[in-house]
Structure formats: C-alpha cells, structure tokens
C-alpha cells in the first residue's frame, strides 16, 4: 500500500483527524532482473552488476485519476563495477536519472483589468526524467603497523570525471526557468 499527501494536508493537525484521512492510498508495481559477476584471484578482485527494472504507481484517486505513473526512483538501468588490486580501487557507476515533476509548458493568464501573469502547466506526475548519473571513483588503502598499533590510511577521489550528476529539479523564479541541482563535483576523499 502506497500513500500520497492530499493537496494542502499536513500531519501536524494537532491530532484532530486520523492520518489516513490526509493521504491518498494507491498501489505500485516493481519488476526487474539483476545480474552479478564476481572475480577473485590473488591480489585482484572485481565485481560487476547490472539491473534492468521498472517501477510504477497507480490507483491513487486524486493523482491522475488513478492512472499509472513512474515512481520517483524508477531507474530503468543501473550498472556498477568495482576493481581492486592490492590497495588500489576503481569504482564505476552508471544509472538512469530520477523522475521529477516538471512543468515544461506555460501560458499567459489574464484577469480583469491590466494584470497579466504566467501559469505553468504540469502534464503529469513524475513527467521528466533527469539525466543519467555517471561516476568514477578512485581510491587507495595503505596499511602499516607500528610497534603496538595497526594503521590504515584511505585516500581517494570522488567523481574523477567531474560529471554533473543532478539529483533535483527546481524552478528558478529569478530567471523563470527550470534548473537542476547537483552536489559533489570532483572531490578528494
């Protein structure tokens, strides 16, 4: 059973109502297949996995009249690969982007008088897929011991390719355009 808040509702209503009255209840389906390959030989270790999946939501009476729509985290393709040799490691990730709510269309609205404003049109729920996420990380683990203590030093670089991996879509009112927000560019670890 899945839930969505009804428009304008909040759980912080002082206990005056049951929380179930503030949400729409619906269903969801998730299908997929995953393949994993693992290799180990002496100092070498490698692992690769691929997932093909589809996740949808439906049956919410107040959301698209119960029609099916993409789940926010419906990522059709996910590929992960890791290779380690002695203390060095490489990790690669490639996956489909999240689904977001976007209003790609606008139209002018007129009121009585001279006031005019622009309205955004949302054609559906989770109607825009964000770009693919691509990341390559490098790392090195150095182990050493002193007389009584074992030490481990880990150094690395996160997102070596400095790929712009957006995770959120928002509307910038100053430029009146949709913008993507990404965190963590190339970063020492």
Located regions from the model:
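Gram-negative outer-membrane beta-barrel transporters
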Residues: 4-6, 17-104
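Aromatic-acidic/polar surface patches that form glycan- and anion
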Residues: 26-28, 72-73, 129-134, 181-182
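Asparagine-centered polar/low-complexity signal
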Residues: 23-24, 80, 126, 159-165
């Amino acid at each position: 059973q899945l839930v969505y808040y009804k428009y304008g509702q909040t759980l912080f209503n002082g206990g005056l109502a049951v929380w179930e009255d503030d949400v729409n209840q619906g269903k969801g389906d998730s299908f997929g297949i995953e393949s994993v390959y693992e290799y180990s030989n002496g100092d070498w270790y490698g692992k690769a996995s691929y997932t093909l999946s589809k996740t949808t939501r439906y049956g919410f009476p107040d959301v698209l009249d119960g029609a099916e729509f993409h789940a926010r985290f419906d990522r059709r393709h996910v590929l992960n690969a890791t290779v380690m040799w002695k203390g060095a490691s490489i990790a690669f990730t490639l996956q489909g982007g999240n689904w977001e709510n976007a209003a790609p269309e606008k139209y002018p609205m007129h009121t009585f008088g001279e006031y005019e404003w622009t309205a955004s049109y949302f054609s559906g729920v989770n109607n825009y897929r964000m770009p693919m996420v691509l990341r390559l990380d490098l790392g090195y683990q150095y182990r050493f011991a002193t007389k009584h203590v074992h030490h481990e030093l880990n150094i690395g670089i996160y997102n070596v390719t400095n790929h712009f991996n957006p995770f959120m879509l928002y509307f910038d009112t100053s430029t009146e355009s949709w913008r993507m927000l990404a965190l963590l560019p190339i970063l020492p670890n």
